[in-house]
Amino acid sequence: MFVGIAAVALAVPRALSAQVPDDTPGLFERLNLDKLRLTAFGAAFGPVAPTNTEPTVAYSLHADYGEIARNWRVVFTATYWGTRYTRETVARLEDKLRESIVDTTVSARFELGRIQISDIAVGGDLRWTPSARVARPYLGGGLLAHVVNAEGKAIQGTFIENALDNIALGFAAVSGVDVSLARHLGIGLQARYDLTSGVRYGTLRATGTYYFDTAPGRGAR
């Protein structure tokens, strides 16, 4: 699972920063996309409680492609979490199904059982980092593509499964702090809120990062 997510997190920015034809001069230079290069790579995890689901843990990977402008960094991310809908949510869904069907025998029963749900979100953040010290707070936002998948024995292959599955763009707000522990290693704490069609959630994540060059604030030795 994470091998595939990591490949996507690395492939997307490489595609964006690929060389463009000579007949479009100045575009990448004006946007500073030609400056992007992989400077750090890391992982994060933390508790998450998406709407109408049981709390779970989110796992993510991040690839830092450096500054696109002064104090503004581009960070590509890929996040996964999996859980199930709460019993109350499933009960409400059963009630709506019951109300939508005319049952002349008054004997129809709806028992959907456990419905699993997962989300894979891939996209990029633009983060404002005002300093390059050992401890570096940041604030920013992102645009991500979410792939939400629902599974359950009772809904497999039905219109219910199709209705719960979703592929949509979403937005994220992010803030946190990164701390350089050693020349190439850093840790951090991040608060994040993701919003997309049908799913929204906040999470607090612990992060770990490997810097290919010297970590900010450490200096060359």
Regions found by a protein language model. Give the residues of each.
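Bacterial N-terminal signal peptides
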Residues: 2-14
